[in-house]
Amino acid sequence: MRKNRKSISKRHQSKARPGPSQQAFDDICFIELEALKEHEEIRPDYLEQLKNEILSDGILKMPIAVDKNTYIILDGHHLLHALKKIGCKRIPVILFDYQSPEIEVIPWREDENITKEMIVQTALAGRRMPPKTSRHMILIKGELKHISILEKDINIPLDKLK
């Protein structure tokens, strides 16, 4: 694993969540897994590790980030696939306005270029980019933060998602 990547456990711990300067997101709601649109492939090793952690906990700790207009996943591809493997039918999401200027996308790798338009076109066409191609950021008090900073702890029992 690369140094700058958080372990699964650390990613699911509580975080300070300062609010964005404008309303770029909505509260948590539940969406059927099949309604969501993906734009990235997943890493099978990470998927299996995440699935096992969720099963061990017996709860889902965090929602995923989704565009409210297209249902494109902004953050949470691996979580979606883990829940599918577990047999869940729906998932808690935070809906974001992907067109908001507060939301930006940057590549994980320096030698790549990625735009919101590329992500939307890829997802709507049913195609996938390589794993960890995009990193969705949100402007909070003049500073770009990873969108997961707004993903609240929810601790929902898995049977509520089946």
Regions found by a protein language model. Give the residues of each.
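Short, charged/polar connector segments at secondary-structure boundaries
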Residues: R2-N69, L74, L80-K162
